[in-house]
Curated annotation (Swiss-Prot):
This is Small ribosomal subunit protein uS15. It comes from Yersinia pestis. It holds the Pfam family Ribosomal_S15. SUPFAM superfamilies: S15/NS1 RNA-binding domain. GO terms for biological process: translation.
Length: 89
């Protein structure tokens, strides 16, 4: 199940530069992180759901690419985002 409209709006408000900023790298990474965290709970219950696991791996790969792009463009924004999201890098 995907994130609710309210949850997405809260993430956009927290990580975006404006109210309609849905395309910045920070917002995209934050949305992907929320979806990944939601799916991790799903997999603790449904261990053999390989179809959804493929989607999860795709999301993780997309997030990794966005983080690499952000790190190349602006290291300070990258470090701030990693800290705010609690990612390990």
């Amino acid at each position: 199940m995907s994130l609710s409209v309210e949850a997405k709006a809260k993430i956009v408000a927290d990580f975006g530069r404006g109210t309609n900023d849905t395309g910045s790298s920070e917002v995209q990474v934050a949305l992907l992180t929320a979806q990944i965290n939601h799916l991790q709970g799903h997999f603790s219950e449904h261990k053999k759901d390989h179809h959804s696991r493929r989607g999860l791996l795709r999301m993780v790969s997309t997030r990794r690419k966005l983080l690499d792009y952000l790190k190349r463009q602006d290291v300070a924004r990258y470090a701030s985002l990693i800290e705010r999201l609690g990612l390990r890098r």
